[in-house]
Amino acid sequence: MDPAGRARGQGATAGGLLLRAAAAAKGLREDLWGAAALPWRSLSRIPKREGLGEEDTAVAGHELLLPNERSFQNAAKSNNLDLMEKLFEKKVNINVVNNMNRTALHFAVGRNHLSAVDFLLKHKARVDVADKHGLTVIHLAAWSGSLEVMLMLVKAGADQRAKNQDGMSALHFATQSNHVRIVEYLIQDLHLKDLNQPDEKGRKPFLLAAERGHVEMIEKLTFLNLHTSEKDKGGNTALHLAAKHGHSPAVQVLLAQWQDINEMNELNISSLQIATRNGHASLVNFLLSENVDLHQKVEPKESPLHLVVINNHITVVNSLLSAQHDIDILNQKQQTPLHVAADRGNVELVETLLKAGCDLKAVDKQGKTALAVASRSNHSLVVGMLIKAERYYAWREEHHESIRDPSTGFTLTFKQDHSLETRHIRTLLWDLAYHQLKANEWQRLARSWNFTDDQIRAIEEQWSGNESFREHGHRALLIWLHGTLMTQGDPAKQLYEELVHAGFPKLAEKTRHFKSKTDSNSKKCVVS
């Protein structure tokens, strides 16, 4: 070739590359926009993108689409037959692939566009192309659930036994998407029972149906004798997978076939523990109604109650306690559920466990009570709640009253008090702590009120510095107020008398003028 010819050829090549690059940039934007609507987004785990070498970059460049090729794929996505016809007449390559190795047929099948699929198959579109995740059009037809498209693809010679990179066949995809007609066609018409194989996770189609909670599919696979009690590579049965996602109806159907409601997976976790860990309250209630073993011995030892406390599922906590779950059961660290809740500073869970009458004296492997754990973790609100509870239950025991059956009329709570009824007395206590009491004087008061040394230390462990005694004293006074209201006493009157008894007569006098404001409200106060 002469130099001029070579120059023209190089110019044409450069122009073509520029054209393809511009089209690729536009096409990438369109692909990203369109991906959200495509069914195959969730069909395969997307591998992590690695850096491209020179050879990879060159390959990627060849995958970029020209404008007409991009338009043709977009026409297939939107079922635009007129545009597909026009572009086909312009000799567009109908089998061209995009950067994900997908053809126009992938898009048409994925969106159930019968007309576009028919057009492509009549013009000899390839049915054997797998995208970068191994997905073929037969997989997409099974996923999208169009029996008509499936029939067309089978007639065109699509590989009925193809698997993607995750080892999933058309039967897996149809099962996962709950397309019963597709499953019936594959098994009863095409006799493809050999597709009933585990995927790369060790899951047969039956396990996928259970994981998705597809009751109709579970029943159909059972009818077709494709059910299994086998476990996947994680040691999960169909029951475990259904429980993980809270599929109560599916669990009910599965339990009708297998009676071992307490079967463990490879991690020694039962269905109840899976359901509690994930906070599936309705499923937990169903399993409890089926007499599931509440206190199954497992390693590592985390009871259902520990699991719901760890994962903050308070509704499930109430269900377990109503079913008589051992409230003081120990885990491998010899922690009760209260220890765990206190360590996390979870006020609502601590409140629930305290009101249920848990053991406040239980110690873990380090010899720490829940109070010591909360104090160490700097959860001052929980520390206050635990001290209130210790004093409350000590008072009930002294008066021989049932912990679970309070005789007094107040609403029991150990939370911080924000009620209007106690506003005046709380104002007095704040003034007393921050303006009247000197360093070390609140401890004298606390001991006169029978606070234990552990309780005083727990209060002192939060906050530090020269002025910290004011905050400590205020917290102790509020805890005392809880006990006074608990016994239906008059807070202002009792405060006056006890200040005198503790050796603070001048401070006692300063409380007198609050009495008239609190007399009418003290009997109505809610314990906090």
UniProtKB/Swiss-Prot annotation:
Sorted UniProt keywords: ANK repeat, Repeat
Disulfide-bond pairs as recorded: none
ANK repeat extents: 67-96, 100-129, 133-162, 166-197, 201-230, 234-263, 267-296, 300-329, 333-362, 366-395
Domain Death residue range list: 427-515
A biological-process GO annotation: signal transduction
Pfam families named in the record: Ank, Ank_2
Descriptive protein name: Ankyrin repeat and death domain-containing protein 1B
InterPro entries: Ankyrin-DD_containing_protein, Ankyrin_rpt, Ankyrin_rpt-contain_sf, DEATH-like_dom_sf, Death_dom
Keyword Repeat: yes
Annotated organism of origin: Homo sapiens
